[in-house]
């Protein structure tokens, strides 16, 4: 999860030993370990082996770069360094703010200078530092405090930072709501009002694909302020982050459809970004003897310590998209009799809500004409609720399908502009008529888009801007591309389907 744990103390104060004893070495970036990557131990002027600091100008930027890559995935991370000066922690604060991290400092500064010197001499020779270094750092401690916004704990208080399940037994029901994807009508049909006696958990993916993104977000902005509501972060919420920051990384679908809806509804970028900042990475709770893990993507087992699980795995789930069923089976295999999992995000096989006796899948493809899935837990146990999608939305999606592959090309002038000068398109002129075909580079590099797929036996009269002949768009094997995977085909194909065999 998004937790950064900084060690703070002079050499010999016990930082590295603490990390080892707590089993945190796999999660640690160590300044000395990185120094040893740049240079092996060297002899000092007294003939003793030591860790060289000659490459610190390269090492520190590398450590921060590595830390940022881990933060992008939401990895729990420990930084093993002295962190004596307040300014040493400024860069960490900046990254933590950008990636929604909480920072803790484990404080080893109360050890006496005599004890630190004694412990220093007990370390392996190459790990020892001169006594004057320890003395200098002790002198710096008096003038340097931990910056605001960073929580300081003692080594014996490490358990305070770990994620702990919340007891929801006082509520009448715990209600879980699956992927919404901009489908407001089925959400509102199910969620007529918020009952203060119930607790509500939304599993993420609130936007995109549907046609009512603004209405969904406006409702969730109101619910986010309630004490009995938790909103999880799904993978599509990264688009809200990018939108709020005016970043161009948002998906094309978001930029072309969702963003205009939000702007037209008067939802400011600041409000959208603040909403994203409030989203939770997961939610684990107990309810009258049951322990339930709720995440967007689903995990392969109930972790002993949720804080050590990367946020990316909580959002996208264990494994890849197609592994959802295997992951749920694994969870059930490892689960105690009272442990359960609820997730959304992926449903490659189209399984029902109750996958097995321990796992529930709330991805119902509501935006594809499926159902909004909900799961209610009360003293009577789990109960499944589904709400179908609106007919007008299905009509909208059908129209979108009809406009895709092999549809009539309406704007030939625009198509010619897209073909012209495209390095992946080969044009051959026959007077006023030109043929357009994708190049070998496009084929071997799999550089397929709307233009290269159409450039297949395509003949256009450039004077009249009319198509005189064309082949089918480039087609692909089953599972060759995301849109030809079985899970996608069940949404994209128009039935009845005619199957043909190509005889070579």
What is the role of each PLM region?
Residues 2-8, 13, 21, 27, ...:
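Conserved GTP-binding G-domain of TRAFAC-class P-loop NTPases and closely related GTPase folds
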Residues 155-219:
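N-terminal active-site segment of His-dependent metallophosphoesterases
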